[in-house]
């Protein structure tokens, strides 16, 4: 495949995704709604993530003049397109022009890329910055350059401001530097890159120190390091899920590259790509085995990993490269259709395939309507999913929205920054999916119901009119 053909495939899939977003019929997922809310309250850090995604969303909403779902999710395909173009140049510089087109076409059709081109996440931005850092790093292995060292440091620093998962690449990269002479760069360039990365990351590190290491503690919490125990099934499930994240043939090729390295059949460049990718998969598989890990936690492996797989397939199994592009390409074309027909695509148990992306805004609108009827403009909830959507869906209304104040440490950004103030008195509307009683009064039940589809299907939701003091921790 020529570079021109690869470029056309990248542009073609991007255009398809941009057009299909116009017909998206799903709600924001809780994380997307939260990222949007962060963008309305700019800071140097947040409860669960560094600040980059909020800054990027704010830039888009300012440029577009809209807070609509379309414009925010549009960032996904556009940034992935940019990452694909950077990877093409990286592959050309590190391997040669023969895989430049294949690298771009393969990356843009990865299942994980297809998914995050529809539902926006931090992974999208993270992959872009890692691609930039990798391009500069490979350049530095060939020549000394202050400019490339600055770019590498900037890429790593901005990746850190996006998601701390960039650090998963460090152990493998360090091993490559120790074992492979061709992987080493000039000491001066290392110092420059590290210094720039540190300066870029410093504002978020300072923010964490000022907020009791909130983001760091949250990262530890979701990793479940306090509940360590060997569970081989979890590890195997995570490992198997990687065949779905990048496609079966691409992940197989990455494993094949490891086998080749162990058998002494790979050259230094192939070894470098292995060390910059597969240790990430190994680390997160270990994390899944002893605690917990989500399928996308190893995503940082698939920047270098894509180049590695494409190169090996190009040399040893060209038919596999074409087959992979066909399989992943078809899946990538079909996936946006699931967001256009979310109510029609059902699983065998009757649930919508897009269940967790449906029914959220409807609950928020119901709460708003009942608040108006009840004569209050204050809506409180103890559910993170609900408060996230309340802020987004009711963004143009005048309701005052709060999370119920926690009894201990906050467990979300909303409890941390937007908990119900103690000085609020009088009646408020309380939305919950759990049982609720008050010691000092009998709450007035405005509505109890069970949604028939979407994220809250099968759950009993309740809306009460109650004194604010009843919601005190």
From Swiss-Prot:
Q: Where are the transmembrane segments?
A: 6-26, 68-88, 94-114, 118-138, 160-180, 190-210, 238-258, 271-291, 295-315, 327-347
Superkingdom of origin organism: Bacteria
**CC annotations in GO:** plasma membrane
Q: Kindly give the InterPro entries that the UniProt entry links to this protein.
A: LipidA_mod_glycosyltrf_83, RgtA/B/C-like
The entry summarizes the disruption phenotype as follows:
Cells lacking this gene produce lipid A that lacks any detectable GalA. Inactivation of this gene also results in a product that is affected in the addition of GalA to all positions in the LPS core oligosaccharide, possibly by acting as a less than an optimal substrate for RgtA, RgtB and RgtC. The mutant strains are more susceptible to deoxycholic acid and to the polycationic antimicrobial peptide PmxB when compared with the parent strain.
Q: Which GO terms describe its molecular function?
A: hexosyltransferase activity; pentosyltransferase activity
Any single GO BP term: lipid A biosynthetic process
Major site of localization recorded for this protein: membrane
| Subcellular localization | Cell membrane
Question: Keywords of this protein's UniProt record, alphabetized?
Answer: Cell membrane, Glycosyltransferase, Lipid A biosynthesis, Lipid biosynthesis, Lipid metabolism, Lipopolysaccharide biosynthesis, Membrane, Transferase, Transmembrane, Transmembrane helix
Q: Does the keyword Lipid biosynthesis apply?
A: yes
Q: What is its EC number?
A: 2.4.1.-
What pathway is this protein a component of? Bacterial outer membrane biogenesis; LPS lipid A biosynthesis
User: What's one Pfam family here?
Assistant: PMT_2
Query: How does the protein associate with the membrane?
Result: Multi-pass membrane protein
Q: What does this protein do?
A: Involved in the modification of the lipopolysaccharide (LPS) lipid A moiety. Catalyzes the transfer of a galacturonic acid (GalA) residue to the 4'-position of 4'-dephosphorylated lipid A, using dodecaprenyl phosphate-GalA as the donor substrate. Acts before the other GalA transferases RgtA, RgtB and RgtC.
Which protein, by its recorded name, is this? Lipid A galacturonosyltransferase RgtD
């Amino acid at each position: 495949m020529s570079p021109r053909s690869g470029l056309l495939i990248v542009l073609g899939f991007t255009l398809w995704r941009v057009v299909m977003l116009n017909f998206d019929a799903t709600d924001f997922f809780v994380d997307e709604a939260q990222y949007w809310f962060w963008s309305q309250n700019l800071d140097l850090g947040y409860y669960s993530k560094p600040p980059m995604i909020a800054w990027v969303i704010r830039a888009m909403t300012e440029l577009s003049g809209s807070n609509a779902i379309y414009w925010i999710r549009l960032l996904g395909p556009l940034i992935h397109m940019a990452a694909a173009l950077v990877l093409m140049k990286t592959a050309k510089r590190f391997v040669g022009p023969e895989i430049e087109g294949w690298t771009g076409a393969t990356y843009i059709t990865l299942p994980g890329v297809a998914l995050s081109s529809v539902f926006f996440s931090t992974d999208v931005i993270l992959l872009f910055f890692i691609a930039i850092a990798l391009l500069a790093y490979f350049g530095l292995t060939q020549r000394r350059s202050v400019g490339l060292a600055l770019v590498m440091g900037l890429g790593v620093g901005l990746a850190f401001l996006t998601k701390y998962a960039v650090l998963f690449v460090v152990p493998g990269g360090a091993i490559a530097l120790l074992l492979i002479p061709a992987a080493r760069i000039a000491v001066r360039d290392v110092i420059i890159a590290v210094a720039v990365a540190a300066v870029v990351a410093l504002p978020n590190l300072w923010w964490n120190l000022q907020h009791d290491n909130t983001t760091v503690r949250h990262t530890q919490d979701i990793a479940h390091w306090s509940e360590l125990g060997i569970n081989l099934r979890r590890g195997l499930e995570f490992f198997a899920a990687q065949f779905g994240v990048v496609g079966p043939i691409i992940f197989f090729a990455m494993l094949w590259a490891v086998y080749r390295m162990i058998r002494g059949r790979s050259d230094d460049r192939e070894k470098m790509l292995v060390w910059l990718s597969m240790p990430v998969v190994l680390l997160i598989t270990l994390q899944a085995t002893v605690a917990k890990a989500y399928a996308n936690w190893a995503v940082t492996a698939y920047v270098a990993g894509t180049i590695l797989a494409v190169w090996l397939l190009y040399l040893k199994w060209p038919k596999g490269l074409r087959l992979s592009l066909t399989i992943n390409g078809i899946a990538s074309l079909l996936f946006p259709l699931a967001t256009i027909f979310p109510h029609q695509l059902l699983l065998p148990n009757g649930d919508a395939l897009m269940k967790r992306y449906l029914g959220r805004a409807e609950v928020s609108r119901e709460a708003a309507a009942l608040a108006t009827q009840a004569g209050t403009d204050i809506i409180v909830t103890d559910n993170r999913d609900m408060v996230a959507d309340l802020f987004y869906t009711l963004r143009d209304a005048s309701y005052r929205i709060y999370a119920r104040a926690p009894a201990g440490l906050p467990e979300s950004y909303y409890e941390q920054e937007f908990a119900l103030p103690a000085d609020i008195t009088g009646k408020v509307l309380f939305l919950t999916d759990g049982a609720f009683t008050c010691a000092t009064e009998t709450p007035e039940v405005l509505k109890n119901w069970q949604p028939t589809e979407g994220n809250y299907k099968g759950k009993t939701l309740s809306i009460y009119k109650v004194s604010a003091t009843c919601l005190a921790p």
